Amino acid sequence: MNNRRCFTFLAVAAALASGLGLHGAMAQDWPTRPVTMVVPFAAGSASDTMARILSARLSEVLGQQVVIENVSGAGGMTGVARVAKAAPDGYQFVLGGVDTFAQNQTLYKRPLYNSATDFAPVALVVEQALLLVARNDLPANNLQEFIAYAKANQGKMQYGSAGVGSGSHLACAQLNSAMGVDISVPQEAA
């Protein structure tokens, strides 16, 4: 089974296991109109890609279109806050993660929502690893060589992340600190 097919299967299985496929058992018909899945990161991000795969199958299961809306900003906080303030009618939900529901609560002095009281978890859809990758012409073939290269080229290296305050940004900052290097300039999302 190829990776995309396996990923799609796991995402759909998680959604079905969460009860989304059991709409006939609900007291009222739902959904009767399209449902919006807010992705708190830019189009093309890992979260966006996952949401698009998941929404296609959810649309089939629910019998209504699941529309993706990318609302990025503040490490995902902007999109999540939008859903926190939306009418509690079940027609808008957010695809978030550790960065949007745990990190932001401690990273910002005044987060725009309370993860513990404004939201209820529905399903674990995917677990995602962060990878350290570089161009194949970088003269480093392992982590030890990468650290040595980064130390020898302080301030000259850059990394890409999902944006300031995102999980990938904080992971890079932690890596910088652990390695004692200055790899900077998070690239802005599209």
Summary of predicted features, one role per range:
Residues S47-G63, H169-S177:
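Short, polar/charged alpha-helical segment
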Residues G21-A27:
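Sec/Tat signal peptide C-region and signal peptidase I cleavage site
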Residues N3-F9:
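N-terminal export leaders
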Residues L10-G21:
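Bacterial N-terminal signal peptides
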Residues R33-A42, V66-V67, Q92, A120, ...:
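Short, well-ordered beta-strand elements
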Residues K85-Y91, T106-A190:
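Hinge/capping helix and adjacent helix->loop/strand transition within the periplasmic-binding protein
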Residues M37-M50, S72-A74, S161-S166:
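Extracytoplasmic "Venus flytrap"
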